[in-house]
Regions:
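Short coil/turn linkers that connect adjacent helices within long alpha-helical scaffolds
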Residues: 20-24, 62-66, 104-108
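Cationic, low-complexity basic patches in intrinsically disordered or flexible, solvent-exposed regions
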Residues: 10, 130, 136
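Intrinsic-disorder/low-complexity detector
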Residues: 3, 61, 70, 96-103, ...
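Conserved alpha-helical positions within TPR/SEL1-like repeat arrays
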Residues: 15, 27-42, 57, 69-84, ...
Length: 136
């Protein structure tokens, strides 16, 4: 198991540098927020993970085109937190947004699309909607 609190410490130091060096809507700031969110997620602090994933997402929405794969990843990260928290309707909402971007931005045989289908199917499975899960 990783030392997530140590990772978080370094992610936060890096983020402080990014904040001083980059404009507030720079995608690298969003990537930094995502890394911090990921550390909180791995530590089991899902509300903090969600907070940082949402900060990242707000920057990506402003800085990137609407079909950019990083936006899809951002939606997926948020969906993952909601899945773990058991809020399946919210998880589906974000996984489906992610999937729509991936369908537009990626080739039909891209592994990330397979992951997207799997995420949506897993949520339906968790909800007990097994026939719907099998569609994915």
């Amino acid at each position: 198991m990783g030392d997530y609190s140590k990772a978080l410490e370094f992610y936060e130091k890096a983020h402080q540098i990014y904040e001083k060096a980059l404009p507030s809507n720079h995608p690298d700031l969003a990537t930094s927020y995502s890394a911090i969110g990921g550390a909180y997620y791995n530590m089991g602090d899902y509300s903090k993970a969600l907070e940082f994933y949402e900060k990242a997402h707000q920057i990506y929405e402003k800085a990137l085109p609407s079909n950019h794969p990083s936006l899809a990843t951002s939606y997926s990260n948020i969906g993952q937190v909601y899945t773990t928290m058991g809020d399946y309707s919210k998880a589906l909402e974000f996984y489906e947004k992610s999937h729509k971007i991936k369908e537009k931005a990626l080739p039909s045989n891209h592994p990330s699309l397979a992951t997207s289908y799997s995420n949506i199917g897993q949520v339906y499975n968790n909800m007990g909607e097994y026939s719907k899960a099998l569609e994915f």
